[in-house]
Amino acid sequence: IKTSESEGHQKDAGILSVEDFVRKIKDYDVISFDIFDTLIFRPFSSPTDVFYLIGEKFDFLDFKNLRVWAEWDARMKCRQKNGHTEVSLQDIWENLEEDTGLNAEEGMRLECETEEKLCYANPYMLQVWKRLQKLGKRMIIVSDMYLPRSCIERILQKTGYTGAERIYISNEYGENKAGGDLFHRVIRDFSGARIVHIGDNP
């Protein structure tokens, strides 16, 4: 994965026509996509705004701030224990249950259901995905995310992104895109392949 190429292709997305963008990336052996803000959009200016809705359902006034803090605290605990900050939704909600008394299982279910309900496809990228699919291209998904695989797979299914060869989620590996470790795993798994990434990091 060449950073300069990936950054250039990300800038091209949405500027070029779908056909021109596909033409620029179709000769790579493997095409990697980020999920959120690339394949998938949320109807908020900030991803944490979804916590307002979850707080309303729990009738918990200061839920957003508590949810943000619980994630930060879970990451700090994970860093101390494991040397990285990639946490799962369960890690976060166990913190919340301890601090607020809210039921972790119910909270995780509600957060996933809310994300699944609100997320929608980036129409440009969905066309790109479908076009590459028709060409028989190998496509993978790489995401720095705390949501569980089951939730992410349902979001992708609902929004029309089917047929990914592999889905890499940071909280399953304790590695992330931002630090490069998750991309190194991808490169090892697809040894010798020419790979391009569409999204952030790199």
Residue spans for each PLM region:
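N-terminal accessory alpha/beta regions
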Residues: 65-93
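Hydrophobic, small-residue-rich alpha-helical packing segments that form membrane-like cores
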Residues: 118, 123, 129, 155-172, ...
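Conserved Lys-Pro-Asp/Glu-containing loop-to-beta segment of HAD-superfamily phosphomonoesterases
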Residues: 179-202
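Short, solvent-exposed loop/turn segments at secondary-structure junctions
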Residues: 36-40, 45-46, 145-149, 173-175, ...
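Substrate-recognition/cap helix-loop segment adjacent to the acidic, metal-dependent catalytic center
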Residues: 100, 133-140, 145-171
